[in-house]
């Protein structure tokens, strides 16, 4: 059990800085006396009341709306008070301080503190309370953070579906089927003297096979949801003046990186998140790769190689106007050799031939798009002009293919890497269970254990079996007041 989860808590629930409206939120059990002290009257549940907010001396701090949500019909499942005032940081700090002060003051009716133990909330603690009070499960709690952090419309919509329970419903259906299968195995173990073969009569083989098929479908949708949330990291690399910064600007649709004819203009990485069909791509422009005597440029080049080593995909940019020049091709070959050593084996390296609009007569020049051969021996290359935009759609298609994106299916929900890991664990345990069922005289105790472990992995997704350490990591990523 998480520590101090019964303390009443308070926090500013809106983002730091100035705004038209700011909210101070209080959650706890039995906060009625504090509500009356702060608002000067009892409030009707779930109705907005316009009133002045006053300090301990009766002086007005501000005027605004107060809303009272008695348990269990609130965000946290506890009594909740929200004070909506003008969004200046000083006003909100004064309101928050007044909440903490009034909680410790003696109530006139009882002579006891109005809300003893009221403290500032930790990041994510209001949502943590909602989880602990069964208002939401863990996957829905994560969806709240994903909705707040969504960088694309598709990511926001998928997070909203997860918050509504779409992902959790799929997990619960898998769990129910798994529990039924476990019941058959446990019955066979518990009543060995019975003549009924529970497993054969109930077609345990067929049930397990159907469960594995459903799991495969859920894993496919989960991979797509994780992609919408996480995106992929794409590094643009190549020699100086190949057009790396121009390509970043073209993909982003904005002048993010400085472009000049001077080699070595880019000294450090420039990063921008773009979206293609709702998939976030974290594109990084790097320093031109070459031997340099300039200390600052050398640092930038080393950082470029570090980014390449951590990339999900690398765009190796070539200058079509210099194709066929021995020195240029030799330098490209050296970069290609180091890419083969530095980039992880599973990371695709795409050859991108730039400046097709200026390469008339070049053997490699063309109309733009995806070519059929690659100068560095890889399967395909992309030919384009970052200046005119010719061929960019072909590159976008290649990037979506690398990401593993399929056209967005209806009802896709957001997901996280830990969800995929849990589902892979379920898949592994179900495969072990299937192997046991295939044996003559299966070891029922081993079969039962594999099914138990599969259910445990499913429960970890929704938080029905989750370590306190994991909960701490998840909720600490929220902002204070959420």
Swiss-Prot record:
Binding positions for (6S)-5-formyl-5,6,7,8-tetrahydrofolate per the UniProt entry: 25, 82, 135, 482
SUPFAM superfamilies: P-loop containing nucleoside triphosphate hydrolases, TrmE connector domain
Cofactor(s), by name: K(+)
Residues engaged in binding K(+): 241, 260, 262, 265
UniProtKB keywords: Cytoplasm, GTP-binding, Hydrolase, Magnesium, Metal-binding, Nucleotide-binding, Potassium, tRNA processing
EC number(s) stated in the UniProt entry for this protein: 3.6.-.-
Keyword Magnesium applies: yes
Family annotation (Gene3D superfamilies): P-loop containing nucleotide triphosphate hydrolases, Probable tRNA modification gtpase trme, domain 1, tRNA modification GTPase MnmE domain 2
PROSITE patterns hit by this protein: G_TRME
Name this polypeptide is given: tRNA modification GTPase MnmE
Organism whose genome encodes this protein: Paracidovorax citrulli (strain AAC00-1)
Taxonomic path: Bacteria, Pseudomonadati, Pseudomonadota, Betaproteobacteria, Burkholderiales
């Amino acid at each position: 059990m998480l520590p101090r989860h019964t303390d009443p808590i308070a926090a500013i629930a809106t983002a730091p800085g100035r705004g038209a409206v700011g909210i101070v939120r209080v959650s706890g059990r039995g906060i009625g006396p504090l509500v009356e002290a702060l608002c000067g009257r009892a409030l009707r549940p779930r109705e907005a009341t316009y009133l002045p907010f006053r300090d301990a001396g009766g002086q007005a701090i501000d005027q605004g709306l107060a809303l009272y949500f008695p348990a269990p019909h609130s965000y946290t499942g506890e009594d909740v008070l929200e004070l909506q005032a003008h969004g200046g940081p000083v006003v909100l700090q004064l309101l928050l301080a007044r909440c903490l002060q009034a909680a410790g003051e003696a109530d006139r009716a009882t002579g006891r503190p109005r809300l003893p133990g009221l403290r500032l909330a930790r990041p994510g603690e209001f949502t943590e309370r909602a989880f602990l009070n069964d208002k939401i499960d863990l996957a829905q709690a994560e969806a709240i953070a994903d909705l707040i952090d969504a960088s694309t419309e598709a990511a926001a919509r998928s997070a909203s579906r997860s918050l509504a329970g779409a992902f959790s419903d799929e997990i619960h259906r898998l769990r129910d089927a798994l529990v039924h299968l476990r019941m058959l195995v446990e019955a066979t173990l518990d009543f060995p003297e019975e003549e009924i073969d529970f497993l054969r009569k109930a077609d345990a083989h067929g049930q397990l096979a159907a469960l594995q098929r459903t799991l495969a479908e859920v894993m496919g949708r989960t991979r797509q949801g994780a992609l919408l949330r996480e995106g992929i990291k794409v590094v643009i690399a190549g020699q100086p003046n190949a057009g790396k910064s121009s390509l970043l600007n073209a993909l982003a649709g904005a002048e993010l990186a400085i472009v000049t004819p001077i080699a070595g203009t880019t000294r450090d990485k420039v990063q921008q998140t773009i979206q293609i069909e709702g998939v976030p791509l974290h594109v990084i422009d790097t320093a031109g790769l070459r031997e340099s005597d300039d200390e600052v440029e050398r640092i930038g080049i080393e950082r470029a190689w570090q980014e390449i080593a951590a990339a999900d995909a690398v765009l190796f940019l070539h200058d079509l106007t210099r194709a066929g020049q021995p020195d240029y091709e030799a330098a490209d070959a050296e970069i290609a050799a180091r890419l083969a050593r530095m980039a992880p084996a599973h990371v695709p390296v795409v050859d991108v031939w730039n400046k097709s609009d200026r390469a008339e007569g070049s053997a490699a020049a063309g109309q733009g798009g995806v070519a059929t051969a690659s100068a560095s021996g890889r399967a395909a290359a992309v030919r384009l002009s970052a200046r005119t935009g010719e061929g960019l759609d072909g590159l976008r298609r290649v990037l979506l293919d690398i990401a593993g994106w399929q056209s967005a299916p209806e009802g896709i929900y957001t997901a996280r890497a830990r969800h995929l890991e849990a589902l892979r664990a379920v898949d592994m345990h179900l495969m072990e269970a299937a192997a046991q069922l295939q044996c003559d005289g299966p070891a029922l105790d081993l079969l039962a254990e594999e099914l138990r472990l599969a259910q445990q992995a499913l429960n970890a997704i929704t938080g029905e079996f989750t370590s306190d350490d994991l909960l701490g990591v998840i909720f600490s990523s929220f902002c204070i007041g959420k």
